[in-house]
């Protein structure tokens, strides 16, 4: 029986990284977590690392500013998964260029998964500013990976449920509104809503699969392909409460960017791409992509209906 690939997770204490670590351990992979010495100032992250260590993970100290430490860490594994923070923290995404250089020098990595996990940056050249900068930077990382001929898989995980399902996709809310809900446009644009735990499972499933080599894996479980209005209706049915619906035109929505911080403007522009332009589901998956729930039908993914029950 072939041994399971050894996996190094970079950003393993982050929002999605911790789910990837958990899935890697659960699926029987020797799991390594990269950590920086500065982590000692964050007690919660230290506790998380120690919890993962107790469950079998190995901790490797390294730094993006120490090339040799990165190379040494990479040489101990077969697969590298980066889950460094993105969005408005631009320098984190571009720091992956240092990781690419380490992987290139080590020469032993069978698969690299860079930090993406949202909309496919390869399809977002039309994105509006300032949200487009996230996709531009992720493309720079892709270009470096491909120029170095590093075997890779890109993961497009769409909407993280923890951010938007509970709040019914209301800006700044993570819990269900009690009286009214804003619908973007007519509320009928399709999106894809994914439990973060499932992102971890599908990511780990993909790293040894020849069908995902040098391809983009789109996580599109069919029961979770829903419009915002459909998500709202599911909550109303589950909670047995009707909400007043306020339909927001694209002009009114974009006017809300004025006076916001840079990070908030990025978030608003991404909402525009998802709920007005439909950029999560307005395209067919091409020959360079595959769909996760079709590849792994045995994974029992969490439906939006099931996910919502925690908010009752």
From Swiss-Prot:
The active site is at residue 138. It catalyses: (+)-lariciresinol + NADP(+) = (+)-pinoresinol + NADPH + H(+); (-)-secoisolariciresinol + NADP(+) = (+)-lariciresinol + NADPH + H(+). The keyword Secreted does not apply. NADP(+) binds at residues 11-17, 36, 45, 142. Belongs to the NmrA-type oxidoreductase family. Isoflavone reductase subfamily. Reductase involved in lignan biosynthesis. Catalyzes the enantioselective sequential conversion of (+)-pinoresinol into (+)-lariciresinol and of (+)-lariciresinol into (-)-secoisolariciresinol. Abstracts the 4R-hydride from the NADPH cofactor during catalysis. Dimer. This is Bifunctional pinoresinol-lariciresinol reductase. It comes from Thuja plicata (Western red-cedar). The lineage of its organism: Eukaryota, Viridiplantae, Streptophyta, Embryophyta, Tracheophyta.
């Amino acid at each position: 029986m072939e041994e399971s690939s050894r996996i190094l997770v970079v950003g393993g204490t982050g929002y999605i990284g911790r789910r990837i670590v958990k899935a890697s351990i659960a699926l029987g992979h020797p799991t390594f977590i990269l950590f920086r010495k500065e982590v000692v100032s964050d007690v919660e992250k230290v506790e998380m690392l120690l919890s993962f260590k107790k469950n079998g993970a190995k901790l490797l100290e390294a730094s993006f500013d120490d090339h040799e430490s990165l190379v040494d860490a990479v040489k101990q594994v077969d697969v590298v998964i980066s889950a460094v923070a993105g969005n408005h923290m631009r320098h984190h995404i571009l720091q992956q260029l240092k990781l690419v250089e380490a992987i290139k020098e080590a020469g032993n990595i069978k698969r690299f998964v860079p930090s993406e996990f949202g909309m496919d940056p390869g399809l977002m050249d039309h994105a509006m500013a300032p949200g487009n900068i996230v996709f531009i930077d992720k493309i720079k990382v892709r270009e470096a990976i491909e120029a170095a001929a590093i075997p890779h898989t890109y993961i497009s995980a769409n909407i993280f449920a923890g951010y938007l399902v509970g709040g019914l996709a209301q800006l700044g809310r993570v819990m269900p509104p009690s009286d009214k809900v804003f619908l973007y446009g007519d509320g009928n644009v399709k999106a894809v809503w994914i439990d973060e735990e499932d992102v971890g499972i599908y990511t780990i499933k993909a790293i040894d699969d020849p069908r995902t080599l040098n391809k983009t894996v789109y996580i599109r479980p069919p029961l979770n392909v829903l419009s915002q209005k459909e998500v709202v209706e599911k909550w109303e049915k589950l909670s047995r409460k009707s909400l007043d619906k306020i339909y927001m035109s694209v002009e009114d929505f974009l006017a809300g960017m004025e006076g916001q911080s840079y990070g908030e403007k990025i978030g608003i522009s991404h909402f525009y791409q998802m709920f007005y332009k439909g950029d999560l589901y307005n395209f067919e998956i091409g020959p360079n992509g595959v769909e996760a729930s079709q590849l792994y039908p045995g994974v029992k993914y969490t439906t939006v209906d099931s996910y919502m029950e925690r908010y009752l």
